[in-house]
Amino acid sequence: EMQQKNEDTAASDTGENSIQVFERVEQYLTSNLVQAPEVADSSVSVLIADTMAAEPNVRYWQRMINIGPAVNLLRYDVRAQVQFLKEKLDFEYMRIWQIFSEEMLIQLGEHNVKYNFMLLDQVLDFLVNLKIKPHIEFGFKKHTYFEKVDRSILKIYKDHSLIRLMQNKGFLEDLIKHWTTRYGTAEVETWYIELEKNSVIQETISLEQYFEVFETVYAIFKNYAPGIQIGGAGFSLNVIGKSFEDILRQWKKRKYQPDFVSIYSYPYNYQNKIVDEQRNEYASNESYLADVIYEAHAQMKMAGMTDIPLLVTEWSSTLSNRNCLNDSCYKSAYMVKNMIENYGKVPTLGYWVATDIFSEGIDLNTFLSGGCGLITQNDICKPAYFAMEFMNHLEPYIIGKNENAIVSSRKDGVYFICCHNYKHLNFRYYSRNENEIEIENQQRYFSDNESLQMSFRIRHMNHGKYIVKIFFIGPTHGNVQNEWKQLGYLESLSIYETDYLKRHCQPELSVFYVEAKNNELVIETHIAAQEIQGIVVAEV
């Protein structure tokens, strides 16, 4: 409501809008060093979990992660990070795109086709040898990254390249034959093939053309590897809105239905005519991902497509790879909040994107660039990485959850809790371009700075003493941005300084003991704003 007010009230006669007035007041306060006091009292959250109510843990966030254009996987530094991510976070699938490109030695013209599978083999061999399943995006996704998101990016694509797949049936046949021969049909049948239709940036290809391309690929591939999963179309509900249902209805009438329907989630408003021109396109909705999933399921139901799984193949808090919030603990809290909030709703949630190497550019000479990756170019784990790591520590059974936490157990009296104190962005954020947010002033963009007192009551516990170990990543610990600040935002880091940061970007740990009484164990913890915690509980 606050936000509405600020946007609607025109300010005084000077013609300034309320946000500008606010900015001036704030600049005055900042320059005169008036600090808003940290709110003393924190809000309280209680979660009751029950060991008798255990359900198997479905690790849908661990199923797939976006890696980048196939050509990146020929690089040593990217491979090293992929190996690290497989070893530490054990993703089952990795999603790659742009496998049909001249850099990959595959040239699909309208009439003349030249191709050599040598480089593609190197990429897929690398993944398969690491026991990573490929999730391959066949659409011609451009290798672009954005500094900020505005309407101009909707006009980038004018390429009908998807149709080239239809014109090259012989090539598709060679490709799938080559794969089944090289990797064996059983292996290839575990792969996912996705065909993007209208990504965040709309392509100029009609629905009819899309269906024809999809059916061409589907028929040829299923002929050689019947079990391979082929779906699409990378829908962004913020772009197509209600027409999603109509597209699905038409798809249902076609010869082949997709094995899965895929959507993307990036919180932007494209449809709404944003009245106040001072605003960026960011959607202010705090549960954006949950709403998109809910809406997509609702429309799939109306279209009679309830038996087809819905996959979120890309999700992030932003499309910008020059937004310093990507490097901050805001991002880790955002991720944990969303992974808990959407638990059990979709089989796959593919985070965008694994590494900052994806978003390199000529403008990049800073140590932290505001990229969407889990890891920096110099192999330092960002708070976003620890969001995944903490969630991965959840035990095989889930015994309780609420909006701030999820509690898990295993058979032998070991428990793991993952919790967060996410703070949403406020109206100031919407008046800024994403690449203009100052690393020192992030605080100004959050709804509040209150800490959270959480209390977990776990029922049906054995009597006796338990050890509690709390790992935390937050504004002052394990946070690469904060550690870099201690080094005076030094631009060019030596190997020694990079190693120093690697050692310091780790969760902090505190340990204490609690006693279970009346078959109930109560654990209390205090969580700072934008902090995440992983809590291990074990019988002593």
What is each model feature region?
Residues 312-438:
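Aromatic/acidic polysaccharide-binding cleft in carbohydrate-active enzymes
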Residues 81, 268-323, 338, 344-356, ...:
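Glycoside hydrolase catalytic-domain groove-lining segments
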Residues 89-282:
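Substrate-binding cleft and catalytic face of glycoside hydrolase catalytic domains
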Residues 1-90, 529:
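Mature N-terminal, pre-catalytic/accessory segment of carbohydrate-active enzymes
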Residues 6, 12, 22-29, 33, ...:
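C-terminal beta-sandwich/jelly-roll accessory domains of carbohydrate-active enzymes
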Residues 58, 71-75, 104-105, 271, ...:
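Short, solvent-exposed loop/turn elements at domain surfaces
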Residues 2-30, 166-242, 256-262, 301-319, ...:
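Active-site region of glycoside hydrolase catalytic domains
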Residues 49-52, 72-86, 178, 241-251, ...:
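Short, acidic/polar
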